[in-house]
Amino acid sequence: MIERGKFRSLTLINWNGFFARTFDLDELVTTLSGGNGAGKSTTMAAFITALIPDLTLLHFRNTTEAGATSGSRDKGLHGKLRPGVCYAALDVVNSLHQRVIVGVRLQQIAGRDRKVDIKPFSIHGLPTAINPTEILTESVSARHARVLPLSELKEKFEAMESVQFKQYNSITDYHSVMFDLGIVARRLRTAADRSKYYRLIEASLYGGISSAITRSLRDYLLPENGGVRKAFQDMEAALRENRMTLEAIRVTQSDRDLFKHLISEATNYVSADYMRHANERRIHLDAALLLRNELFTSRKQRASEQYRHIEMARELAEHNAAESDLETDYQGASDHLNLVQTALRQQEKIDRYDADLEELTFRLEEQNEVVAEAREVQEDNEARSEAAELEVDELKSQLADYQQALDVQQTRAIQYQQALQALQRAQDICQLRDLSVDNAEEWQETFQAKELEATDKLLMLEQKMSVAQAAHSQFEQAYELVTRIAGPVSRSDAWQVGRDVLRDAGNQRYHAEQLEPLRSRVSELGQRLREQQDAERLLSDFCKRYGQQVDAADLENLQAELEAQIELLNESVADAGERRMTLRQELEQLRERIARLTKQAPQWLAAQEILSQLGEQTGQALENSQQVTEFMQQLLERERETTVERDDIAARKREIERQIERLSQPGGSEDARLNHLAERFGGVLLSEIYDDVTIDDAPYFSALYGPARHAIVVPDLSLIREQLDGLDDCPEDLYLIEGDPQSFDDSVFNVEELAKAVVVKAGDRQWRYSRFPKVPLFGRAARENQLEVLRAERETLAERFATLSFDVQKIQRLHQSFSRFIGSHIGVAFEPDPEAALRQLNGRRNEVERELNNHESENQQQRQQYEQAKEGVSQLNRLLPRVSLLLDDTLQDRHEEIQERLAEAQEATRFVQQHGAQLARLEPILAVLQSDPEQHEQLTLDYQQAQQQQRDARQQAFALTEVVQRRAHFGYIDSAGMLNGTSDLNEKLRQRLEQAEAERARAREQLRQHQSQLTQYSQVLASLKSSFDAKRDMLKELQQEMQDIGVHADASAEQRARLRRDELYGALSNNRARRNQLEKQLTFCEAEMDALQKKLRRLERDYQQGREQVVSAKAGWVTVLRMVKDNGVERRLHRRELAYLGGDELRSMSDKALGALRLAVADNEHLRDVLRLSEDPKRPERKIQFYIAVYQHLRERIRQDIIRTDDPVEAIEQMEIELNRLTEELTAREQTLAISSRSVSNIIRKTIQREQNRIRQLNQGLQAVSFGQVKSVRLNVNVREAHSTLLDVLSEQHEQHQDLFKSNRLTFSEALAKLYQRLNPQIDMGQRTPQTIGEELLDYRNYLEMEVEVSRGSDGWLRAESGALSTGEAIGTGMSILVMVVQSWEEESRRLRGKDISPCRLLFLDEAARLDAKSIATLFELCDRLEMQLIIAAPENISPEKGTTYKLVRKVFNNTEHVHVVGLRGFSAEPGAATGSADVGAH
């Protein structure tokens, strides 16, 4: 036998008065004994909180604020806790000996609302030796411990492998685990279930008869028959759906023609517009592409013209630049010619003035010589005149001095003084400080010798002077010629320079002789150089036109290539005409074939559309007409086979429906007559008695009773004996068994059980061997199981039957479609695809057109290449004669070399022309330059110096002589000798004075005469000099002008300049002609470009408009396509045959359909509005929206469960197949699903009987319960009178109320409610609807009235009410009822929980002092018999003899309040050891 789970202990952590306390719970009764405030209610509150941690339910009244009902107020739990983390944990061992600790963590929340936070948890697999207190606290010291928070507790168990810790976020999950482990008796899924459980605990806790429970005993004791109720609801829903479907089918049948017309016209309306927009979009797209191609072609042409314009503009710019350069060169050449002519005239002037200057130079030189000679004579005369004057002056002076000294009366002192003066003067003149009278003679001799020497030197110099006077004029003339030729030179270097000049003059004359040959050579090379530059320019132009760099050596090869290219281009141009003609003929043929196939395509497309539909319907590829005819024969054969199979399925389905109907009989009777017989005999069907047998036991009992399994159990067979006479409406074999239906068992048989069989010994000579049936039908569970199998098979057969029926109809319609196809389209359907041929032909046409365009462009390119080649050959013809010039790389160097030599020759010629005469005059007198022209002057200076030296020497000698002569004066004065000497000297002086004066007069006269002659000579020289200077200045000006002109004029210069000017004029004329031609071509090109630009603007504008139209249309078209594809209507709208109709035809087709649609949707406001919006031609998507709206409207009007498709068009096609079949099938189904009122009555009655039997069994467990004067307690279950009348009418008089149950407007529930109102008009139904009332009437619990009765004293059975019972009697009665509820819950939940688990049973009782000792003993006995645990709270004076008693005393120690607990095992036993010592102090 399975052991019942037990609560082992209750642990309180950090509660008010309990810091860490574990109460071991007794297997029966645990008593909490103590005075007021000892903690009994706190302990029970902790237990209840751990069981039901729902703050919306917890309400501990004895400690709660009076009248408090708000959820935000304290419910009595906040005050029982201490600050910090608190725990309430239950240690449980279930039937499987699994230890589980379930509990809650509680914590006060600060605030005025005094709320509490609760977190449920559970611990699994904890070893038995570990106390719950040890795991929820942590020891800090010997007397202190710390409460672990939930997070640390979780971490602590995560470290233990065998222990599992779970934390729950919802109370439902927490109770689900408790139910699965057998801790609570009922699965508490909802808040209502928790409320019932809490009300049960609350009623137990506070004792007495709870009016909250007794008023709703049906909810606590009677299980909800959800299966029956759901079956009724499903049947009603199926009937309702069936009726709605039938109504929808009828409406659909009436609207089918409207639907077909609507979808047909909507398809024509939208598809015509859809295809028109598609065609227009394609046309616009093709036009845009054509415009784009034309635009690109024009752009290419414009680019080509621009390139040509740029090239011509570049060439024109080059010609303009060249023209400017040529004009400049021409003007320069003209100016150069003018300069040459001017230079020639200047050169003539220069030559003329040069000749004049040469003549003047010769005359000037002669006159200079004359003037020089006259000036020399003049100087000599002046010198003689000065000498004469000096001599006269000196003689006069001497004579005067001597006159003064002639005084003979002078004393010797004066003479002596004169001698001394003479000596002093001699010392000064001779610069002899040591001169004396004694050595005066010696010094006189010395100075006289010097005087002689000076006189000799003077004579020698005079000789040289005479020689130099003769060569002086020739030296000056030669020196002047050297300086004029070589420039300024020193007189000392004149001879060397003159010799070098004469030596270089020969080279200059040789170079001058080479001038004319060099000039002709330079002219020739210049001409060739210009021709080379022209050839290079032509080659450069040719390379630019040719597009690549070409060497001069390759020009001949290039000419051959161009000539060959010209020949090829001539041939290709000749072939181009034939090719163009061929392409145009082919293009015309293609256009004709395209037109023919375009007419044929719509018929072929219509045939292909039907053929594709037939292919989709058949799933086969129909490739030829023979396959079509063969498939028609196959369709006929398949129709015959499918019809036979459908009839077989229909027969099997009817058989299964008969079996289901037989098994669905109330009470399990397979024959409806047995129910009537059972009611007639007052018995019960055996199948009803065993209706609750499990499916596992069903084979055994089915074999046990054998044929008697459909027997009727009656109380007394003798009472029905007479009724058997004349009984004819019954089965062939009717079995009757005597027995009490309330306590019937199988003891009437002697049975021996075998393997999968039984042997029933009916007598000594009669045995029956029955095997267990493979499909047992005994018992409701077995029948329901078989019914499920049969219903599933019936559904399968129904689906198969529907499928086959649909297939038959489908095959028939498919055969008709094939017949129509053969009659209309068989002739064109299997011909080649004209659209494929059109695509190929269009592709070929495009290729031909492209090839023709390419041919035209290639022909044009060839013409351009031909023109370029001809022009290239023309340029090469001009270049080839000049190839040698292009290849002559030394021409420039040779020209420069000859130009340098020509410059040297010109310079030599200019030198010879300028200095030829001077060189001729210099050559014979060059030798005079050997003497330095400055030596004559030096000689003159030396002569004068020698003359001065001779004069000084003479004076010195004279002074010494005077000293020597005055030597006597140093003695005594010889007056006589002095006077005689003075007279002689005076006479001599006078004679000399006369001579000197005469010489002076002659010199003066000669000087005067020569002065006048010199003046004449000077005037002639001045005249010659002024004339020479004027002509020389004019010559310098002419030479400067010649230098400024910068032209060397020669005999051929003018001819060369004129030839150069004429060449440049010819080049300028050619350049101007080419420039004018380019300007004309450029003007023509600009005109073409302007025309192209206008064309491009027009094309761009047209293309932009077309592109904007295409883009805008594309945006709308993309929206249309997306809508079409998303809604799956593309196949309906994209009708390819309409693509070949014109826009006017499609518009006419759409307008006709629009008129028909306006009439068709006139009564539908939504479709009418959508149709009106769709008429906007600028919004094509609105037509699609209208089509979708039509589709949606059809989808809503056509049942998708009837028509197995999402396409309304296909649905309309299938509708004709399905409607008749579904109508018949649904009508039959409604008859099958129709609920019989008699069946409903029987089901409700049987359910009531079953629950009454279960309540009787529960009452048997309460018969021995007694409290005080109460001897027994029982539950009384009665059927309400109004509901009993309803059942009787449903069973017996249902024919009178068929107007309700046969109405298609009322469901069975509504019909049942209407019948109930009809039978009980006095009852007020309030605001409830008939459907709600009918659903309540289908619940059997609403038919029953339950009340608790007690047998008390002499009063007998009385209704249990608190006012009629004492407190103890009320507590005992209430406890008995609660035990009954718990037991009922366990039986109800046994099928939800494992069979090997027996749940815990525990109730509470507070304030047990209200019971006497006998009542408590009875309560203990009840707990023992029902294996129930009980926790009671009693005052200190009550100590039960059995169970475990805890003495609770609240104490205060060191300002800490705690509850001292002592545990006792029975009253008479010694006080046992407490489960734990006093609470340790809080940490």
From Swiss-Prot:
Query: From the record, what ranges are coiled-coil?
Result: 311-426, 547-607, 835-1115, 1206-1266
**For the region Flexible hinge, what residue ranges are annotated?**
666-783
Give UniProt keywords alphabetically.
ATP-binding, Cell cycle, Cell division, Chromosome partition, Coiled coil, Cytoplasm, DNA condensation, DNA-binding, Nucleotide-binding
One Pfam family this sequence matches: MukB
The ranges of region (Disordered) come to: 850-870
Q: Quote the cellular component terms of the Gene Ontology held in the record.
A: cytoplasm; nucleoid
Gene Ontology MF terms in the entry: ATP binding; DNA binding
What InterPro entries does this protein's entry cite? MukB (IPR012090), MukB/SMC (IPR050308), MukB_hinge (IPR032520), MukB_hinge_sf (IPR042501), MukB_N_dom (IPR007406), P-loop_NTPase (IPR027417)
Binding-site residues for ATP, renumbered to this chain? 34-41
Q: Name one GO biological process term.
A: DNA replication
**Is Aminoacyl-tRNA synthetase there in the keyword field?**
no
Where found in the cell?
Cytoplasm, Nucleoid
The domain-related comment in the record is: The hinge domain, which separates the large intramolecular coiled coil regions, allows the homodimerization, forming a V-shaped homodimer.
Family that this chain belongs to: Belongs to the SMC family. MukB subfamily.
What this protein is reported to do is described as: Plays a central role in chromosome condensation, segregation and cell cycle progression. Functions as a homodimer, which is essential for chromosome partition. Involved in negative DNA supercoiling in vivo, and by this means organize and compact chromosomes. May achieve or facilitate chromosome segregation by condensation DNA from both sides of a centrally located replisome during cell division.
Subunit composition and interactions: Homodimerization via its hinge domain. Binds to DNA via its C-terminal region. Interacts, and probably forms a ternary complex, with MukE and MukF via its C-terminal region. The complex formation is stimulated by calcium or magnesium. Interacts with tubulin-related protein FtsZ.
The protein's name: Chromosome partition protein MukB
Species assigned in the record: Erwinia tasmaniensis (strain DSM 17950 / CFBP 7177 / CIP 109463 / NCPPB 4357 / Et1/99)
Gene that this sequence comes from: mukB
